[in-house]
Amino acid sequence: MCYSARVQQHLRALARRFGAEIDWPVFEQFFERRLQDVGLKVARALERNFDAPATDVERRIHARIQAYRQTIATKWETDLFRQKKRLADAQRSLQEKETKKARDDERIATSKIEDYLERLGTLRSSDALEGDDRVFPRYFVPIVIREGGRLLIRPMRYQCRLAGKPATYDERYPGTYNARRDNLEGFWSDVYGTQHGVMVVNSFYENVANHVFERRELAPDEKPKNLVLHFNPQPPLEMLVACLWSHWTHKSDPDLYSFAAVTDDPPLLRTH
């Protein structure tokens, strides 16, 4: 099943291609909400739409993105300081006596320091980086939909929570970022045929068991191993991925627009 993709997220390019309107109010609401819930995720490619704001709404969104980055940077800098202290304490302890705990603390702190420095460098970089357009489940992605007779581009979460279902469905059904074709008239019947959208994808990634990829049975005592397949058309080609979407509402929670990509087994895994 597709678990990650590199997605076209240039909003004005999408608007021109599909003759669609950008749903600015929903984009603004999303970036405002992210200030309160820093766990909401987007790819850097989506944020880049607001690097050089030209309208009032773009300037407001740009300000929210900058405020979010400052909040995240402050948190990571605090965590970085803690790990540096942990490393220094471990190294002092090792000078006095070799212990497993001190050696583990040194190793873990060193790894985390490198990780936080890399994160902060990426956060502060103004350069376009490889993978800026890559999304994963629960990322918010621009999707082209038809609503009220209009084509709209709207940010939606890449894991669909169907309207009327409890929020606990996110954990109960973690695979709902994909909508299998053989279940469209079952689990997805509430939105299939009525609430469709399109995601523009440049390449995508599949998780596959290694023995399945090699078209063989597991050997005795062999444990399944995961293999990540990258489907990357050459020459480069934009693929239109059909999606199902839903607008979830609750009296005590923010509205949620979310979607699932319609998928099937990749061709190399099909048995017929």
What residue spans do the PLM features occupy?
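Short linear sequence motif anchored by a di-proline
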Residues: 1-272
